[in-house]
Amino acid sequence: MLLLLTGVAFSLGLVRAVASEIPALDPAHQQAGNQVDSVIYAADRSNAANRRVLAVLRGDESRVLLRQIDEVAPIMRQAIVSVEDRRFYEHNGVDLRGIGRALWEDVRKKGVVEGGSTITQQYVKNAYVRNEQTVARKVREAALAWQLEQKWTKDRILLAYLNTIYFGNGAYGIQQAARTYFKQSALQLTLPEAALLAGLPADPSLYDPTQHRRASKRRRAYVLQTMFDQGKITARQLARANAAPLPRADDVRLPGTRGPAPYFVNYVTDQLIAKYGAGRVFGGGLHVTTTIDLELQDLAHASIEKILRTPGGPSAALVAIDPRDGSVRAMVGGSSFRQSQFNLATQAERQPGSSFKPIVLATALRQGISPLTRFDSKPVDIDAGDRIWHVTNYEGSYIGRTDLSRAMVSSDNAVYAQLTQFVGPPDIVKTAHALGIRSELDPYFSIGLGFVAVNPLDMTRAYATFANRGKRVDGTLLGDRPRVVEKVESARTGEVRENRPIARPVLTETEADQLTSILQRVVVSGTGKRAALSDRPVAGKTGTTDNYGDAWFVGYTPQLAVAVWVGYPDELKPMLTEFGGKPVSGGTLPAQIWKEFMAVALKEQEAAPEAFAPAGYVPTQEKRIVWRSGAYRLDNGFCPGTRVVAYTAGRGPAEQAKCYANEVAVPLVIGLTIDTARANLAAKPLGASLIGVPAQPGKRTGFVVKQEPRGGFLSAGTTVRLFVTRPDPRYGLVPNLVGSSLEDARARLGKLELSPRITYGTGLPGTVVEQTPPAGVAAGPGLKMELVVARGKPSETP
């Protein structure tokens, strides 16, 4: 029935899809003038009519049309067909079953659900300027795809598809993609290059090798494996291609962009393409109002130039976000877009050092842990599973037993390494992502000290969440990405879609206020003093990597959150003398740039000095806890290895641990003989009681198969129940038959109700020379015995 309905719907759509529309699908036709410019504007909240144009995106932007399929390397053609439409050369452009499944999902979910399509259908969809999400559009696309297959050759369709798909980083079409990522033509692409490009159209942002290298490498591996599975490449080619390096970010040639905020424009363009597709963004008549404030943008550049004066010295990136609505107000991704299009604000993932510690503290607060919890500030060894992680403080300075608040102000590595172990790296990753960090983060113990890769935009967004009293602000239009667009208008239809701010709670207001109160102390009396403003309170944190290769200051007021990174973009070069002959730390150049920018930015915004919400009194309760049975539990008075933790009243563990007086660990003795198991238990010391369980025929006896308890802890001297295999008393054990005559062996096995299988070998004639299973295992019905008997009769033996 479903296929019948699908066929009817398809037929109706086919009638409507007139042949005259086919020429309009040709990329050359589109490029010749069937396009409406898209325009990107800066924000102008005082007068929308005076919005400044940041960029104009035309249909031929970053696109070079190829005329013949022979201009594309055969391996590139194979790669894209393998991963996007393996039956491309077999079908007629439409998969009726696939359409039927998609229609059924649309009906079932009461909306339109995009599914997999053929290359022909994808090309038709890309070529359409109309991009509304309707069932009718789906059927119409399918009908046009079928018509296209009747008029065009497969090679022409594939070439048109490759000419129109978007590969990310401004590369529209296969020729521009080859030039952008590999500085060569589409005809020169190799297998690993082709596999990388073939994997990009599915999600150019997610699989971008300049921003998400691990995801990009996994996607390339998937394409290569698909080609191997389809017999397109050999195992040797697969291995060599997987080992090939990805293009480096600074090797990728991005299209030139003019205007006052080129790095920001490229970032916005990528977000729009992820939402609307390249066909609508380039030449689709979109008028996009962004969040960028050009006065703040110019100020950000000027602040960096004022502090970083040394030619050939380090570079800086700066991002400013209004915490109240999540809007990105300024973004400096480099000093010269002409020299390098690599965006330091969004693509440079560098270690944040101690500026990541507030995220660790935020994780603790979410678990109900109070900043009053105390740890010892001293060198510590953390068991990281595969190695011991030795943690020390900067310049060997320790402050003794201290709470989390003071440890933050003094940027104490030893304390925050212990806190990382306590709250757990996986929970820190969850908190970081919830705060707005989109970078991939590994849940290693070193995450607590900032040994992870993040970018300035991510860090600004996380701190903006702190500034907004624990609420991360996204937009309604572009999902959980940073809010860089105010609204999108269509010049074709007049439709206006606003990207309204939407707040998502991550921390409670109380938790965020506690964190902000602590970070204010960092600026007043800690490592961030150079960022202090004379007319208003500031909260923030410095960050410096061990080798002085990266330096950060991330801070905020209630009206603006700003991250500043300083370092050398092309290498992890130690900045040992760049601060007046001294090393560059987060409290030096980054803090100075931050202050230079904020002091003027807040005045230009006419932001009156505003105090943060006071942390107030938060009642706490100390609990003595222990890690037991996979969770923290309350000490019952007998637990070893406990610690005291201050929790917000009503939070923290409530279940009591089961610990014992004179507690010892119960060893695992399953699989051991009775004697060995008893000896292992006695060494603790623990006793043993034996419980016999029937052994299966053919299995060993006298071995422990179960114990109660299985691990855990008991008081010394307690008895552990051991379940030991015993033979069935009716049958006993299999006897040793080697050396017996065949007649005697059969008689003995007959008493056990066993009938052996006989094979012959060499040895003393007429005797058993080998038996299976061996003597000593449990006997019983159903046991398959095999005897190897030497040929001849015993009497024939000399």
Language model features with spans:
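Juxtamembrane regions of bacterial inner-membrane/periplasmic proteins
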Residues: 1-311, 328-329, 378, 418
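Short active-site loop at a secondary-structure junction
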Residues: 63-72, 314-315, 338-359, 371-377, ...
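Active-site SXXK
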Residues: 78-81, 85, 222, 227, ...
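Short, well-structured active-site flanking segments
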Residues: 89-99, 172-175, 234-237, 339-342, ...
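Conserved catalytic neighborhood of penicillin-recognizing serine enzymes
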Residues: 108-133, 252-260, 369-428, 468, ...
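Mid-domain, small-residue-enriched loop/turn segments at the edges of structured enzyme/sensor domains
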Residues: 140, 388-392, 424-461, 476-481
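A penicillin-recognizing enzyme superfamily signal
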Residues: 290-311, 318-320, 331, 337-342, ...
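Ligand-recognition elements built from short beta-strands and adjacent flexible loops
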Residues: 608-798
